[in-house]
């Protein structure tokens, strides 16, 4: 008769596992819905500020390049935000203004963002917005 190598060692572990109600990871609690909502709200606010920053820096560049007058750019930015249900008041947010100022040197003549890689963009969003 062959002995089952290690079976006498694993049996007490199985009993202990069953007695405790299963593995520890199965006892983890589901995240509190209130905390999940708060985190989602913060992420949404950051995304809104990021979109507003891109809108602002692009509009400012269009004015600086002489393609749009200030009034036209202001209207275009407000429309772009309103189409997504965002108030144009977010353009006056100090965080949005600061991030836009940081991005303006990374735009080319066509007002396209060229001098910023994905890591730098993520850092800007996480640290400034």
Where do the model's predicted regions map?
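Compact alpha-helical subdomains of small soluble proteins
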Residues: 67-129
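Short N-proximal segments of mature Sec-exported proteins
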Residues: 30-89
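Secretory pathway export signals and precursors
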Residues: 1, 55-57, 106-107
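Bacterial N-terminal signal peptides that target proteins for export
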Residues: 2-12
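N-terminal signal peptide c-region/cleavage motif recognized by signal peptidases
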Residues: 20-23
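Hydrophobic helical h-region of N-terminal Sec-dependent signal peptides
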Residues: 13-17
